[in-house]
Amino acid sequence: SKVLSNIDGQLLDCCSSLTEQRMSHSSIVESMTRADFYPHRPQTVELFQTHISYVFIAGDYVYKVKKPVNFGFLDFTTLEQRKFYCEEELRLNRRLAPSIYLDVVPVMRDNSGNLSLGGTGQIIEYAVLMKRLPLDKMLKILLAQNQADKNIMDAVAEKVARFHRAAETGGKIDQMGSIKTIRHNTD
């Protein structure tokens, strides 16, 4: 029937769009694992993946690209949504780590099909640009090596307490912690 063919057409459009995104992300990942992709020319590039992101450690910098996924409680399936959530990640995380979260940078494709950070051409993706944290200064490492003394722990506690005292509360924020919302996001 006509309704069924419209639904099938929408499903086909959706699926082909997701396939195109995965292919595009494949070329982005391939390019971003090469040291010559980056303007600062790191010696090596390491790739780590989470369920929602590709994380490229490129010398002194880290680039995080969101995967085109939809888990219901978050939807990164369009370029516009990924840009929005990159900007939100930058805005939110700068509150605690302004010297670490540096920018949101576009990944571009030029007329020859070459990819670059910034530059000219068509924006095909966005990445959160961060300063790389020295491993020996990470709290997780300091704790594992029994080097997180009282002064370090007091400084962390004070920073977290200041953050929570200044954080917005009420209304929609309270609703996010409701049983109904939590159940919806986990079922």
State where each predicted segment sits:
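Cysteine-centered motifs
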Residues: C14-C15
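Conserved ATP-binding subdomain of kinase catalytic cores across diverse folds
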Residues: H25-D187
